[in-house]
Amino acid sequence: MDFKTSHVRTFFSALSDEGLAHSTIKGLYGLLNPSFELAVEDGIIRKNPVTGTLGDYGAPAKEKEALTLEQQEKLLKFVEQSNVYKPHLPMMQVMFGACLRVSETIGLTWSDVDMKNREIHVGGQLVYYEGDDGYCFHDSETKTDAGIRNIPMTQMVYDAFRKQRELNLMFGLRSNVEIGGRSGFIFNTKYGRPIMPAGVNSFLKNIVNAYNKKESKLAEEEKREPELMPPISSHTLRHTGCTRLGENNVNPKVMQYVMGCWMSGGHPFSTDRSGAKNIQMHRSQ
């Protein structure tokens, strides 16, 4: 059978009708296009029918929404009062308060945390992928040079690290691995290894499900509509933390620095002390 451009467009259109996201279809396009290009080079076909067919097929990406302050407070209170999920509270507070990527969070070691000066040094991240030794964690540099940064701790984050140290001692969650020459990881499983990113998103999903189950039952008893928590991921916590900074009038350049997204042109704290002051004020919250 000769593959034609119309066949590919029909295929993508069918996937779109099935509700697949544009990003998913784009991924398929990225697999098909070079494969057919190779067939052209080998003389199997004369023309690549896939090239230029991506278009805007598929559902657009949903805009990621941050939790409101009320939702954030309710969620953290629920976790704090839960015997099942309370051990996850410090990690969530760090991600909310420091606006860290999940890879940066699980890659934190105790040597990265300066409790005296209340700063977090972010200089790398842990990524999980298949290498020569199979699937395992790899120490990686941050996505950009901007990812290397020192983040002032809020009071919530400072207390979270203190609590996590207590939990590690109480439950024996000590890091027993060395990855890329780094050791002493803060957030670990019961086996002494860093928590996987999928594991973080898994317990966040379970927390929201448990919260909504409790809220639905309470709303039924009080004869009102339940105020359910939306689905969240590790990125939601980071995005929410950034939103809180904006609500506290932190300078956009300082926000970019904290998020690890600032552009070249000098350290933002060196040119805008008001931004640093706002971060310091935010510490007490």
What residue spans do the PLM features occupy?
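DNA breakage-rejoining catalytic core of tyrosine-based enzymes
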Residues: M1, I45-K47, G58-K77, G123, ...
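N-terminal core-binding DNA-recognition domain of tyrosine site-specific recombinases/integrases
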Residues: M1-I44, A61, N83-V84, P194-G199, ...
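Long, amphipathic, Lys/Arg-enriched alpha-helical "connector/arm" segment
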Residues: S6, D17, A59-P87, G97-L100, ...
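Short, basic (Lys/Arg/His-rich) helix/loop patches that form interaction surfaces
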Residues: E18, H22, K77-H88, A98, ...
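Short, charged hinge/linker segments at domain and secondary-structure junctions
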Residues: E37-K62, E220, E225
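Short, charged phosphate-coordinating catalytic segments
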Residues: E37-N48, M95-L126, K253-V254
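Catalytic-site neighborhood detector that most strongly recognizes the C-terminal catalytic loop/helix
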Residues: G58-A59, A66, L126, M259-S284
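C-terminal secondary-structure termini that scaffold catalytic or DNA-interacting sites
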Residues: N117, Y128-I148, Q155-V157, L218-R224, ...
